[in-house]
Amino acid sequence: MSTPSRPFRSPRRARWLVPVLLLLVWLVVGGALGPYAGKLGEVATNDQASFLPRSAESTRVVDAQQAFQQDETLPVIVVWTADGDGDAAVTAHQQAATRSVAGLEGDPGIVGPASPALPSDDGRALQAVVQVEPDLGERLPDVLADIGDAAGQVPGTRAQLAGPAASQADLSDAFAGIDGLLLAVALITVLVILLLVYRSVLLPLVIILSAVFALALSCAIVYALADRDVVRVDGQVQGILSILVIGAATDYALLLTARFREELARHPDRFGAVRAALRDSWGAVVASAATVALGLLALLLSDLTNNRALGPVGAIGIVCSVLSTLTFLPAVLVLLGRAAYWPAKPVRTGDPEAGHRLWHRVAALVDRAPRRIWALSLAALLACAAFAPTLSSKGVPLDEIFVNDTPSVAAQQTLAEHFPGGSGNPAVVIAEADRLDPVLRAARDTRGVASAAPVTDSGRPGAGTPLVVDGRVRIDATLEAPADSDAAKSTVVRLRAAVHEVSGADALVGGYTAQQYDTQETAAEDRTLIVPVVLAIILVILILLLRSLLMPVLLVATVALNFLATLGVSALVFTHVFGFSGTDASVPLYGFVFLVALGVDYNIFLMSRVREEALRHGVREGILRGLTATGGVITSAGVVLAATFAALGVIPLAFLLQIAFIVAFGVLLDTLVVRSLLVPALARDIGAVAWWPGRLGHRTPAGRD
């Protein structure tokens, strides 16, 4: 009698196939796409013109200016002062200064002849303008060094370089470490925190690997899209993407691994533990990611190019973080089992408080005096929020853009000391050529305008035949106040009103100051539009997840209050600790999107667990069990996210430092006060009614006991 053939290998062996394949796929993804994290800078641009509002008057002037440039150029302003004694006269060196830069004509990167050196009214400074190619890229520092060397040959003087080209070089230098330094600081910080949290060797490395794979995939996708001009990347977006992916992927991984550890204590089988962990946590992870991704996509409604750029890029990073967390991480957890926590050993126990002693005490405190807890927490948050209106978001002056000393800022300060405040950054007026005279008179009569002259055939403003292009002329108006000051912005408003009144001139006013003013106004309009959209998106997601109306409203209100409290504290710290006069116009909106979306994340983690426990044990017990079970992991996630955003501070730009502080402090405030005390205490005090009209909302009043 023949023996029947054996069927395919036991399902017990076949079930190993899926995690092994997933692991191999991610190893290939990481190996093949990993280099794109470093290559993203190749498709990034830090051109300041691309930060302008699409519909602003100053942006239309930028487009109109192109026709008046015989060559595409970027100006370098050379300023000479007395060497060793800045108060000494340097007019005797005027001819030598002119000769020093005249000799640069024809050198690599130099466009046309330099302007003659002109003295300041006080006779203590000279300035000349050298035009360079606008797309020098990595060659720009060398070209600037050549200009500096030539200008430095004037005896008895000290030469400094100011203007757009010098500022661009310093900006590129600030972003130089964004590929390696920022990522290294973030990963090392996260690894140290994970080692302290888990007291394990393998699991922190697995979580870091999951985050790195997510970053590699997201950078590769963004690189491909940016290379095809589908999305735009700059240094700020690049830095935020790295931090966002590392922080979000780690947070989601912490939630899943914490649930897996709980399930290992209940299931002897690692496959069953992973299935249970995924079943109970995937909804919260996906909902949390959706709030962040959709909140970021709301930035597409912005009229500011850099805001719109961050939206899709950040959303891609969040999606890749979720994909890695829900595929790579479960595969590795199945393969490692309890060994993932080595040298710790998850043990089976029936004690729900095991491993959560601290958070059991916090839950007991909330249970004993919920009204007192939420009242004190609310009072503290309101006290902090009271300072929020003092935060100025009108932009920062040039000398505050960088948090360290930079050559271009020092040169600009020297220029402002001896020449009209707006020297080197004139307001630019474009008007119909046949209305040149009345427009010129209107500009010169405007309070705050030091001088105004049409651009001539030589390509420079001054006496001579005005350059007419397509029936239009360009007028450069030098302002009395520094170009980055509030006084200069007020002058631009008056100048616009004056030239707009000239009949038939069709005049437009742009230039650096006008760009700053338009950006400030557009940022305010963006906040008015985007903030309610983000809140509505989050509210809808919470309603779908929690199947309630009142609880989502409560959660959105608490995270909004947390944002206002964070702004209040930030206003005090920025002014009295960092010495900033204000923030970039986009900082409050970025802070809102990140803090509100990420703040809701932690409340989603908490309240989805509370709902799960409440359906089994009642509302009151559900709150206590949910807070006890999630307190540790959510706090760890908050610390990780705060630390990763704090890593943005290694880039010496005020914008990123301000974002780093707002998000880091706000996340810690949310995890330690809002999510740990305020929300549980409010839910405990309100009781089952907070879950109306869902199933929990119809529980008996005993749920409040």
Curated annotation (Swiss-Prot):
Transmembrane segments: 16-36, 177-197, 202-222, 237-257, 281-301, 316-336, 373-393, 529-549, 554-574, 587-607, 627-647, 648-668
InterPro entries xref list: MMPL_dom, Mycobact_MmpL, SSD
A GO cellular component entry from the record: plasma membrane
Subcellular compartments: Cell membrane
Lineage top rank: taxon: Bacteria
SUPFAM superfamilies referenced in this protein's UniProt entry, alphabetically: Multidrug efflux transporter AcrB transmembrane domain
Alphabetic keyword roster: Cell membrane, Membrane, Transmembrane, Transmembrane helix
Membrane topology category: Multi-pass membrane protein
Family membership noted in the UniProt record: Belongs to the resistance-nodulation-cell division (RND) (TC 2.A.6) family. MmpL subfamily.
The protein's name: Putative membrane protein SCO0839
